[in-house]
Amino acid sequence: MEEKKQKVTRRKFVKGSAIAVAGAAGAVAMPNIARAAPVTLKVQAAWGGGIFLENAKSYVDRVHAMAGKDLKIDLLSVNSVVKTSQMQDAVHRGVLDGAHYVPAYWYSKSKAASLFGTGPCFGWSAQELLGWIHYGGGMELFNELMGSLGLNLVSFFNSPMPAQPLGWFKEQIKDASQMKGLKYRTVGLAADVLMEMGMSVVQLPGGEI
């Protein structure tokens, strides 16, 4: 019922507007009303494939379903425009409209970033992380972190990841002393923890392995 009233009101408005223009301007032609071109956002993901890229595509599909033809997200794979470590600054400068990645990838800017995703192994679950973000004050702290870094960004947390597993090793690890000297790849706070344990850690985004 509400939709029907809305259509009638719109029809009357268009008719009244046409009459008003013709009366005021005499022989003024009314142009065809063209549909506005859809807004396209250029968003780069930190993933070259796998489940993380599928998560990004799923997010894009949901946005397209809600926005119809008015909004389009052009999802770019890892390193398409800038390196993963440069994505945050690229969005801030307007080189990219958005980025799909984890905060721990800019750990070099602030170690606090790792508190918002990709923590050390045996940490909290993805559900616990989102609960803290949305109901425990995490989002406010994240926005405060953005402000302290001077970044003009608006973030939305989606596709949460659980804490990463400790890893896969050539030999069974039975004692922490066996980890000394092992070469290990990770990102974020886990890197500092494992280096304290004597491991040789390389911080490298997953999409660049």
For each feature predicted by the language model, list its residue ranges.
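Contiguous mixed-secondary-structure segments that line small-molecule binding/active-site clefts
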Residues: E2-K4, D61-H64, V102-G206
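Alpha-to-beta junction loops
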Residues: K69-L71, M87-A104, K183-R185, M199-V201
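Short, well-ordered beta-strand elements
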Residues: A37-G50, L71-L75, G181-R185
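Extracytoplasmic "Venus flytrap"
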Residues: A24, T40-Y59, V78-K83
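Short, polar/charged alpha-helical segment
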Residues: G50-D74, D192
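Cleavable N-terminal signal peptides
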Residues: G23-A24, I33-A34
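Short helix-initiation/N-cap motifs at beta->coil->alpha
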Residues: L76-D89, V187-L189, V201-I209
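N-terminal secretory signal peptides
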Residues: M1-K12
